[in-house]
């Protein structure tokens, strides 16, 4: 018969503790993606408006971004993150509400930076929508 050696081989995964993190908020017109990383850029947690249960046009609401930020923030709290630096990219409606949600969770926000890429007259933009 096979022996059950599971007790000696199984090791509990040790979570690293990180005191400072960087929040990358990518707010597009259709969705909001929130990623919390450590200082080196290794992802600790992430959440999206679509992953939070919102589909279609409800993904592009400030409330959906708030729910996604709360979900990512709760996982980051398990890593021991206390201070956050926020980097916001994109013109979407979830820019401000995601920062407010992280602030309400008890994180100390050290800085808020807008890192939206702006072309110096690079590629031609898409044609205007005619509705």
UniProtKB/Swiss-Prot annotation:
Single GO term (MF): rRNA binding
Keyword Ribosomal protein: yes
Domain of life: Bacteria
Claim: rRNA-binding is one of the keywords in the record: yes
Alphabetical list of HAMAP family matching this protein: Ribosomal_uS11
Record note on quaternary structure: Part of the 30S ribosomal subunit. Interacts with proteins S7 and S18. Binds to IF-3.
Name of this chain's protein: Small ribosomal subunit protein uS11
């Amino acid at each position: 018969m096979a022996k059950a050696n599971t007790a000696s081989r199984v090791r509990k995964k040790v979570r690293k503790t990180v005191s400072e993190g960087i929040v990358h908020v990518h707010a597009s017109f259709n969705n909001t993606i929130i990623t919390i990383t450590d200082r080196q850029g290794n992802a600790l947690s992430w959440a999206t408006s679509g992953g939070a249960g919102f589909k279609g046009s409800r993904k592009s609401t400030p409330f959906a971004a708030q729910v996604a930020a709360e979900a990512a923030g709760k996982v980051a709290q398990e890593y021991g993150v206390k201070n956050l630096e926020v980097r916001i990219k994109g013109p979407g409606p979830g820019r401000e509400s995601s920062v407010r949600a992280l602030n309400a969770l008890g994180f100390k926000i050290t800085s808020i930076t807008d890192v939206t890429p702006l072309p110096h007259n690079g590629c031609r933009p898409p044609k205007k929508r005619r509705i």
